[in-house]
């Protein structure tokens, strides 16, 4: 789809229903704090995005008690999505999320600044609770990254998360925020998160730092003042319970729940997105565990998701059922 076609598409999607959803959202701002799972992208057997299941996933996340939801990002396999799929998915999620409790954060990242700006303008029309952007594909130069993020921030005035990766420093993100007033949130996966949390807390309390990496160090992250974390969508109740217990002063119970969140980390690393989506199948949300191309996405050095692996994942999931709501 060329730029002119995309602009025409944006005009068509700014229909009365979407505009009405945007006005309603502007009147009911939701807090940007807590557990914000990254939504996974469901595909049909004929390799199309299953938008009905994407919406079903939003309802599922609402039932688990999460504070927010994010799409599309790395765990959404965003790079495999076509622009029209991202536009349509964003519209579907904005529409459904107005009746749900979690805040909605939409991803703006793209290979080029022009494309990212189109997504940002589309988001400005839709009015999600916030936006987020992974660094521009293949770009590591700080000046170029600044221009990319500034262009997104100029095109959409919603609260803005930067996804920090690679060599992006906390100091660089703070410097960017001086020119991007909406940039007050960061999901920091650029190296170990714990020192970054202390940096923001002690030197830039106006920032709201989130973490990722499936909350591997969630308990200490909360001790250091994390504003939230963005795990996958497979078992978000565990993270929600850990967060709520910790902030209710029930530290021992929170620590126990944090240990449960880490039990499945080897499964994600071994079976990759195929294992992640298979859990979504077991939870009754997804119809299959396919990725783009009509086949499961397993890491190059991972283990095939064979029948034995599926039996073992189900056995492990069964052990956690007492703590799962949805």
Please state what every model-predicted region is.
Residues 38, 226, 234, 238-326:
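C-terminal alpha-helical cap/extension of soluble enzyme domains
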Residues 1-16:
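N-terminal secretory signal peptides and thylakoid transit peptides that target proteins
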Residues 166-269:
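Catalytic alpha/beta core domains of metabolic enzymes, predominantly
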Residues 33-44, 296:
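Generic N-terminal amphipathic, Lys/Arg-enriched alpha-helix
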């Amino acid at each position: 789809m060329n730029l002119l076609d995309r602009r025409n598409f944006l005009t068509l999607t700014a229909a009365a229903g979407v505009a009405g959803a945007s006005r309603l959202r502007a009147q009911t701002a939701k807090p940007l704090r807590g557990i914000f799972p990254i939504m996974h992208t469901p595909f049909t057997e004929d390799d199309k995005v299953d938008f009905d299941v994407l919406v079903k996933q939003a309802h599922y996340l609402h039932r688990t008690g999460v504070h927010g939801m994010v799409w599309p990002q790395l765990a959404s396999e965003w790079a495999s999505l076509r622009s029209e799929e991202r536009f349509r998915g964003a519209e579907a999620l904005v529409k459904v999320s107005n009746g749900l409790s979690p805040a909605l954060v939409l991803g703006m990242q793209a290979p080029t600044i022009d494309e990212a700006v189109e997504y940002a303008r589309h988001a400005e029309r839709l009015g999600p609770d916030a936006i987020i952007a992974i660094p521009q594909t293949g770009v590591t130069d700080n000046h170029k990254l600044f221009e990319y993020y500034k262009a997104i921030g100029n095109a959409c005035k919603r609260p803005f998360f930067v996804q920090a990766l690679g060599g992006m420093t906390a100091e660089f993100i703070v410097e960017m925020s001086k020119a991007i007033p909406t940039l007050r949130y960061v999901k920091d996966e650029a190296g170990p998160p714990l020192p970054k949390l202390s940096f923001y807390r002690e030197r830039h309390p106006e920032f709201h730092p989130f973490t990722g990496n499936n909350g591997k160090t969630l308990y200490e992250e909360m001790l250091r003042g994390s504003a939230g974390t963005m795990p996958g969508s497979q078992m978000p109740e565990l993270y929600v319970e850990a967060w709520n217990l910790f902030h209710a002063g029930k530290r021992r119970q929170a620590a126990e729940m944090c240990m449960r969140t880490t039990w499945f980390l080897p499964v994600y690393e071994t079976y990759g997105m195929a294992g992640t989506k298979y859990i979504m199948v077991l939870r009754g949300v997804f119809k299959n565990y396919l990725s783009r191309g009509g086949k499961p996405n397993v890491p190059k050095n991972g283990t095939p998701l064979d029948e034995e692996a599926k039996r073992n994942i189900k056995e492990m999931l069964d052990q956690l059922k007492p703590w799962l709501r949805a």
